UniProtKB/Swiss-Prot annotation:
GO MF: cholesterol binding; cholesterol transfer activity
Domain START: 1-213
PANTHER family, sorted: PROTEIN CBG07384, STAR-RELATED LIPID TRANSFER PROTEIN 5
Example GO BP: cholesterol import
InterPro entries reported for this sequence: StAR-like, StARD5/6, START-like_dom_sf, START_lipid-bd_dom
Name the record gives this protein: StAR-related lipid transfer protein 5
Gene: Stard5
Tissue: Expressed in most tissues, with highest levels in liver and in kidney.
Protein backbone atom coordinates (compact mmCIF):
# COMPACT_ATOMS: atom_id res chain seq x y z
CA UNK A 1 0.00 0.00 0.00
CA UNK A 2 1.34 3.42 -0.97
CA UNK A 3 2.48 5.17 2.25
CA UNK A 4 1.65 8.70 1.05
CA UNK A 5 -1.91 7.70 0.10
CA UNK A 6 -2.31 5.83 3.40
CA UNK A 7 -1.09 8.84 5.38
CA UNK A 8 -3.47 11.21 3.60
CA UNK A 9 -6.45 8.85 3.85
CA UNK A 10 -5.88 8.09 7.54
CA UNK A 11 -5.58 11.77 8.45
CA UNK A 12 -8.90 12.44 6.68
CA UNK A 13 -10.49 9.60 8.69
CA UNK A 14 -9.04 10.97 11.95
CA UNK A 15 -10.52 14.40 11.13
CA UNK A 16 -13.90 12.79 10.53
CA UNK A 17 -13.83 10.79 13.79
CA UNK A 18 -12.77 13.92 15.71
CA UNK A 19 -15.75 15.69 14.14
CA UNK A 20 -18.06 12.93 15.45
CA UNK A 21 -16.52 13.49 18.89
CA UNK A 22 -17.16 17.23 18.81
CA UNK A 23 -20.62 17.16 17.26
CA UNK A 24 -23.25 16.72 19.98
CA UNK A 25 -26.25 17.07 17.66
CA UNK A 26 -28.62 14.38 16.41
CA UNK A 27 -27.68 11.56 18.79
CA UNK A 28 -30.51 9.36 20.09
CA UNK A 29 -29.85 7.39 23.27
CA UNK A 30 -30.57 3.67 22.86
CA UNK A 31 -28.96 2.09 25.91
CA UNK A 32 -27.81 3.32 29.29
CA UNK A 33 -26.65 1.60 32.47
CA UNK A 34 -23.64 0.95 34.71
CA UNK A 35 -22.25 4.37 33.84
CA UNK A 36 -22.18 3.61 30.11
CA UNK A 37 -24.27 5.48 27.55
CA UNK A 38 -24.81 4.26 23.97
CA UNK A 39 -26.43 6.46 21.33
CA UNK A 40 -26.81 6.45 17.57
CA UNK A 41 -27.61 8.55 14.54
CA UNK A 42 -27.92 7.69 10.85
CA UNK A 43 -24.57 7.18 9.17
CA UNK A 44 -23.49 9.52 6.39
CA UNK A 45 -21.23 6.78 5.02
CA UNK A 46 -23.57 3.83 4.38
CA UNK A 47 -27.25 2.85 4.88
CA UNK A 48 -26.80 2.02 8.56
CA UNK A 49 -26.09 3.74 11.87
CA UNK A 50 -23.17 5.48 13.52
CA UNK A 51 -22.98 4.36 17.16
CA UNK A 52 -21.38 6.29 20.00
CA UNK A 53 -20.43 4.88 23.40
CA UNK A 54 -19.20 6.81 26.43
CA UNK A 55 -18.17 5.76 29.92
CA UNK A 56 -15.60 6.44 32.63
CA UNK A 57 -13.07 3.73 33.47
CA UNK A 58 -10.74 3.37 36.47
CA UNK A 59 -7.23 3.54 35.02
CA UNK A 60 -5.05 6.15 33.33
CA UNK A 61 -5.51 6.77 29.58
CA UNK A 62 -2.21 4.91 29.02
CA UNK A 63 -3.44 1.86 30.97
CA UNK A 64 -6.77 1.80 29.14
CA UNK A 65 -5.03 2.31 25.80
CA UNK A 66 -2.63 -0.55 26.52
CA UNK A 67 -5.60 -2.94 26.64
CA UNK A 68 -7.07 -1.86 23.30
CA UNK A 69 -4.16 -0.62 21.18
CA UNK A 70 -3.84 -2.16 17.71
CA UNK A 71 -0.67 -4.27 18.04
CA UNK A 72 0.20 -7.85 17.15
CA UNK A 73 -0.03 -10.20 20.16
CA UNK A 74 -1.57 -7.35 22.17
CA UNK A 75 -3.81 -7.56 25.21
CA UNK A 76 -7.04 -7.09 23.22
CA UNK A 77 -7.05 -10.70 21.99
CA UNK A 78 -6.63 -11.92 25.56
CA UNK A 79 -9.73 -10.27 27.03
CA UNK A 80 -12.13 -9.27 24.23
CA UNK A 81 -14.45 -12.16 23.31
CA UNK A 82 -15.50 -10.24 20.20
CA UNK A 83 -11.96 -10.49 18.76
CA UNK A 84 -10.73 -13.96 17.84
CA UNK A 85 -7.53 -12.72 16.17
CA UNK A 86 -5.76 -9.48 15.29
CA UNK A 87 -2.81 -9.19 12.95
CA UNK A 88 -0.76 -6.37 11.44
CA UNK A 89 -0.76 -6.84 7.67
CA UNK A 90 1.47 -3.85 6.89
CA UNK A 91 3.24 -1.49 9.26
CA UNK A 92 3.56 1.90 7.54
CA UNK A 93 4.85 4.01 10.46
CA UNK A 94 4.90 3.61 14.26
CA UNK A 95 1.42 5.13 14.31
CA UNK A 96 -0.09 3.83 11.06
CA UNK A 97 -0.78 0.28 9.93
CA UNK A 98 -3.11 -2.00 8.01
CA UNK A 99 -4.70 -4.61 10.26
CA UNK A 100 -6.91 -7.66 9.89
CA UNK A 101 -9.34 -8.44 12.70
CA UNK A 102 -11.35 -11.66 12.90
CA UNK A 103 -14.50 -11.91 15.00
CA UNK A 104 -16.33 -15.06 16.14
CA UNK A 105 -19.97 -15.83 15.45
CA UNK A 106 -22.35 -13.73 17.53
CA UNK A 107 -26.02 -13.17 18.38
CA UNK A 108 -26.66 -16.88 18.95
CA UNK A 109 -24.83 -17.65 15.69
CA UNK A 110 -27.16 -15.45 13.62
CA UNK A 111 -24.01 -13.46 12.79
CA UNK A 112 -21.36 -15.80 11.37
CA UNK A 113 -17.60 -15.13 11.77
CA UNK A 114 -16.45 -11.89 10.15
CA UNK A 115 -13.12 -10.40 9.19
CA UNK A 116 -12.23 -6.75 8.73
CA UNK A 117 -9.23 -5.20 6.97
CA UNK A 118 -8.59 -1.65 8.16
CA UNK A 119 -6.22 1.25 7.85
CA UNK A 120 -5.57 2.31 11.46
CA UNK A 121 -4.00 5.57 12.64
CA UNK A 122 -3.06 6.23 16.26
CA UNK A 123 -3.02 9.88 17.34
CA UNK A 124 -1.91 11.55 20.56
CA UNK A 125 -3.32 14.97 21.39
CA UNK A 126 -1.77 17.73 23.51
CA UNK A 127 -4.24 17.23 26.37
CA UNK A 128 -3.09 13.60 26.80
CA UNK A 129 -5.90 12.02 24.76
CA UNK A 130 -4.92 8.92 22.78
CA UNK A 131 -7.12 7.95 19.83
CA UNK A 132 -7.38 5.22 17.24
CA UNK A 133 -8.97 5.99 13.90
CA UNK A 134 -9.83 3.34 11.32
CA UNK A 135 -11.59 2.68 8.04
CA UNK A 136 -11.85 -0.32 5.71
CA UNK A 137 -9.32 -0.79 2.91
CA UNK A 138 -8.43 -3.47 0.40
CA UNK A 139 -4.98 -5.02 0.65
CA UNK A 140 -3.30 -7.56 -1.67
CA UNK A 141 -2.24 -9.66 1.34
CA UNK A 142 -5.85 -9.96 2.53
CA UNK A 143 -8.01 -11.71 -0.04
CA UNK A 144 -11.37 -13.03 1.16
CA UNK A 145 -10.83 -15.87 3.64
CA UNK A 146 -12.84 -19.11 3.63
CA UNK A 147 -15.17 -19.33 6.62
CA UNK A 148 -15.36 -15.54 7.09
CA UNK A 149 -17.73 -12.92 5.71
CA UNK A 150 -15.79 -9.74 4.94
CA UNK A 151 -17.28 -6.81 6.86
CA UNK A 152 -16.51 -3.14 6.35
CA UNK A 153 -15.73 -0.59 9.04
CA UNK A 154 -16.59 2.92 7.94
CA UNK A 155 -14.72 5.71 9.79
CA UNK A 156 -14.65 4.62 13.42
CA UNK A 157 -12.40 4.84 16.45
CA UNK A 158 -12.05 5.65 20.10
CA UNK A 159 -10.74 8.38 22.39
CA UNK A 160 -9.02 7.63 25.71
CA UNK A 161 -9.42 11.02 27.37
CA UNK A 162 -7.89 12.12 30.69
CA UNK A 163 -10.55 12.99 33.26
CA UNK A 164 -9.93 16.52 34.58
CA UNK A 165 -9.14 16.40 38.29
CA UNK A 166 -8.68 12.62 38.40
CA UNK A 167 -5.50 11.36 36.72
CA UNK A 168 -6.39 7.73 37.50
CA UNK A 169 -9.59 7.73 35.47
CA UNK A 170 -10.29 7.78 31.74
CA UNK A 171 -13.29 8.94 29.76
CA UNK A 172 -13.55 6.46 26.90
CA UNK A 173 -15.59 7.54 23.87
CA UNK A 174 -16.06 4.96 21.11
CA UNK A 175 -17.52 5.23 17.60
CA UNK A 176 -18.63 2.32 15.40
CA UNK A 177 -20.27 2.30 11.99
CA UNK A 178 -19.85 -1.16 10.60
CA UNK A 179 -21.38 -2.81 7.58
CA UNK A 180 -21.49 -6.47 8.65
CA UNK A 181 -22.67 -7.42 5.11
CA UNK A 182 -23.94 -10.92 4.36
CA UNK A 183 -27.73 -10.38 4.20
CA UNK A 184 -28.42 -9.94 7.91
CA UNK A 185 -31.86 -8.81 9.08
CA UNK A 186 -31.60 -5.15 10.09
CA UNK A 187 -33.20 -5.93 13.45
CA UNK A 188 -30.30 -8.29 14.30
CA UNK A 189 -27.74 -5.60 13.46
CA UNK A 190 -29.65 -2.89 15.34
CA UNK A 191 -29.78 -4.92 18.54
CA UNK A 192 -26.26 -6.36 18.28
CA UNK A 193 -24.19 -3.16 18.24
CA UNK A 194 -25.63 -1.34 21.27
CA UNK A 195 -25.45 -4.54 23.30
CA UNK A 196 -21.89 -5.46 22.34
CA UNK A 197 -20.71 -1.86 22.87
CA UNK A 198 -22.32 -1.76 26.32
CA UNK A 199 -20.61 -5.06 27.24
CA UNK A 200 -17.26 -3.79 25.93
CA UNK A 201 -16.89 -1.25 28.77
CA UNK A 202 -17.16 -3.56 31.83
CA UNK A 203 -15.04 -6.18 30.05
CA UNK A 204 -12.38 -3.58 29.33
CA UNK A 205 -12.55 -2.37 32.94
CA UNK A 206 -11.85 -5.93 34.14
CA UNK A 207 -8.90 -6.15 31.73
CA UNK A 208 -7.41 -2.85 32.97
CA UNK A 209 -7.64 -4.11 36.56
CA UNK A 210 -6.17 -7.48 35.65
CA UNK A 211 -3.22 -6.24 33.62
CA UNK A 212 -2.41 -2.98 35.40
CA UNK A 213 -3.37 -3.17 39.07
Amino acid sequence: MDPSWATQESEAVAEKVLRYRRDASGWKKCREGNGVSISWRPSEEFPGNLYRGEGILCGTPEEVWDCIKPVASGLREKWDDNVSSFEIVQSITDMLCVSRTSTPSAAMKLISPRDFVDLVLVKKYEDGTISSNATHVEHPLCPPKPGFVRGFNHPCGCFCEPLPGDPNKTNLVTFFQTDLSGYLPQSVVDSFFPRSMAEFYPNLQKAVRKFHH
